[in-house]
Amino acid sequence: MPVVWPGGKRFAFTIFDDPDSQDEGVSRLVYALLDDLGLRTTKAVWPLGPRRRPNSPGETCASPSFRRHCQELQARGFEIAFHNATLHASLREETIEGLELFRDYFGRDPLTMANHYNEEAIYWGPAR
């Protein structure tokens, strides 16, 4: 079955931005450019702040300013996605809390996600 692209187009292009190593200042610059260019991309977030030592630098939605920034992006048509609960491995309860926070912050469950490289990710260990 052939793929039918929106608007009769022959292909589609997307960007899925994961939050590793990105701070709010950089995010604001990048998304201002994407917005100016009329591109609507996907920004993944960590809803939950760290509970243990992070294994990646980057912002989480525990920062009210960063959370507002992501909500503003969503309001402008950018998709917000889930990148697991936080920037380190999460227990089941923390993952559930992260999903609940995502719903609270963005008004729905995530439609897309990309695994972070933690123990709960599907590609963790030697198979990664």
Task: List each language-model region with its residue ranges.
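Catalytic alpha-helical scaffold of carbohydrate-active enzymes acting on polysaccharides/glycoconjugates
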Residues: 1-128
